[in-house]
């Protein structure tokens, strides 16, 4: 294992590197994780190991928050039982919002951790991304963008699915 410190910024070119960066950043989270994405499909928060990272983060302290802004909630509603269970178990700590129609053209993705670390996917259909560690100045504009999207978006209430 390489003991050298991680580069503060790293360009990412593959899906494998992207997934690795997601796991790295979720492991660093101490207060808040903010996500903006089309549908969470590429972030795969419902994958077993990644879901465990999200659960460990959110369960560690009642003040921790996960805020998610989505264009489309279909993946969360239909193919994310682990994430839906976390939302049920930790009400108020995990919040989802959906963008209004006029913002659905936005095609990037953001994963922002504690205002310090981030993963910026330049276009949701391409792996090309940038991972930023311990650089709040670099991420300030992205954080403001997330807050603007959050304010412009409507709260998303996931319906309860009853098994009959």
Spans of model-derived segments:
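Acidic/glycine-enriched edge-of-secondary-structure segments
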Residues: 1-16, 31-44
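Charge-rich, low-complexity N-terminal segments
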Residues: 4, 24-25
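Signature of lipid phosphatidyltransferase scaffolds
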Residues: 12, 122-164
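Terminal leader/tail segments of proteins
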Residues: 16, 56-57, 65-66, 147, ...
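Short beta->alpha connector loops
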Residues: 16-18, 101-102
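Amphipathic coiled-coil/heptad-repeat helices and related helical stalk/stem segments
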Residues: 18-19, 50, 79, 142
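Primarily the HKD phosphodiesterase
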Residues: 25-90
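HKD (HxKxxxxD) catalytic microenvironment of the phospholipase D
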Residues: 33, 95-142
């Amino acid at each position: 294992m390489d003991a050298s410190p991680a580069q503060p910024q790293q360009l990412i070119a593959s899906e494998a590197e992207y997934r690795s960066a997601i796991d790295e950043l979720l492991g660093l989270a101490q207060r808040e994780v903010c996500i903006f994405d089309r549908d969470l499909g590429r972030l795969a928060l419902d994958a077993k190991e990644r879901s465990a990272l999200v659960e460990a983060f959110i369960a560690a302290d009642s003040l921790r928050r996960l805020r998610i802004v989505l264009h489309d909630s279909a993946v969360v509603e239909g193919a994310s039982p682990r994430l839906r269970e976390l939302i049920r178990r930790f009400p108020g700590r995990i919040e989802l919002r959906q963008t209004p129609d006029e913002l659905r053209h936005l095609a990037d993705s953001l994963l922002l951790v504690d205002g310090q670390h981030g993963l910026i996917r330049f276009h949701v259909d391409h792996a090309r991304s940038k991972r930023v560690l311990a650089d709040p100045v670099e991420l300030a504009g992205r954080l403001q963008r997330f807050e603007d999207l959050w304010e412009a978006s409507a709260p998303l209430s996931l319906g309860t699915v009853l098994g009959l």
